Amino acid sequence: MSLKSFIARKWAAYIRKKIDQWASDPIVTQEKVFLSIIQKAKHTAFGHDHHFEEIHSYEDFVQRVPIRDYEALAPYIERVKKGEENILWPGKPLYFAKTSGTTSGAKYIPLTKESMPYHIEAARNAIMCYIAETGKADFVSGKMIFLQGSPILEKKNGIRLGRLSGISAHYVPKYLQTNRMPSWKTNCIEDWETKIDAIVEETIHENMTLISGIPPWVQMYFERLQQKSQKTVGELFPNFQLFIYGGVNYEPYRQKFEHLIGRKVDSVELYPASEGFFAYQDTQTQKGMLLLLNAGIFYEFIEADTFFSENPKRISLKDVQLGVNYVLIVSTNAGLWGYNMGDTVMFTSLKPYRIVVTGRIKHFISAFGEHVIAKEVEEALAETLAQQGGEVSEFTVAPQVNPPAGELPYHEWFIEFEQAPKDMEAFAHTLDQALQAQNSYYKDLIEGKVLQRLRITPVPKGSFAQYMKSQGKLGGQNKTQHLANDRSIADKLSEK
């Protein structure tokens, strides 16, 4: 065992103990965070507008601070962008994390001197939890790669802005600097395909032990490595031990990854976002990610089924239940208040509080009242691949509301197969049965002859990468939408 590995084990045990302390007293931990951020922001413009000086309890907060999405918060954000101070949080933010995804264009999410350290600490602690539980620490002596956006930052009215992953690249701890790849020069390449090729050249002969990134883009990296070397990733990197990922559900990609690697590797899931680092997988033995309760973020939840009603009920952590699909609402030490993340989560454990991300509140299919969510299609596909074989590179699902005359409507699955199943008919049947098992409304519609069984439309290799490229979303933090209630993606994929 190297000295670095020995120190990592000792440090991991210490970090795990600290985590267990706040996780064992979750409600008090959240109460402290809540009172702290309210007190800190009392004299901001937002605090004055919403009478923070009168807020002494969660009930007070609910009465004074409505739920907002980015568009509703934008007037305050615009003032911050113009250089005004003390708007959402004392002073000015250190950075704006620039993300895509609103009707009005890019989002500018503030990162403050109080919030930024938690982003870095959470990523580190996820690794520490893995070491503390498994005792595996040899990977810290090898090379590590973090597939991320360009670290080149712009500046606007004294505030730097860029992609969150690019901003985070400026905070890599000193003890990782010599292990970290790719080089700064390569990391600054904007074009994703050019960047991947450069990363392959830099890493192909290195001792890679930890690889991190969003699964579809790591998959592209692995495929390029295999094309160049004619070897599996596991043969190229015999000491590759840990895959760290976030952004999308890994299960639909797992078989493909294991084929590319040539063996199984341990994995750790993260739940980072520009708005905050919310959770990470703290154990290899239980489902879900530990919700980070002491990270300057106060959490609220709204049942997804009631979210679009006139006055949906907001609850704090103490009232959540297992197995209920909730919309995640956050208030943070970066100046977001009652902020609708748009993500849906479900608790898998209440001691400690662990969650899985189930999808996006706007990403669903309910053209016929079925309200199928991302988690359901992803789990149905993973189950089908396990039963029927095949490998999937990427997929999306859309409703076909207007089929040819005389036919019932159906869900159309556009799947890019790396390796097609031997029997596509059996695959489609198993997939439909798996989705019915996931969603009782869908099952009722099938049995009631409102819908016919789903159909699979295989698309050529590279179709999804081409689609993402056409949208200016190839690489980085961008993710393929796995289902939609319209056919905007489906129609693009159907174009000849």
Could you tell me what each predicted segment is?
Residues 130-174:
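Conserved AMP-binding loop of ANL adenylate-forming enzymes
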Residues 1-53, 61-68, 75-79, 83, ...:
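Active-site glycine/GP-rich loop and adjacent strand/helix microenvironment
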Residues 85-86, 105-115, 235, 242:
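Non-catalytic, beta-rich accessory domains that mediate macromolecular interactions or localization
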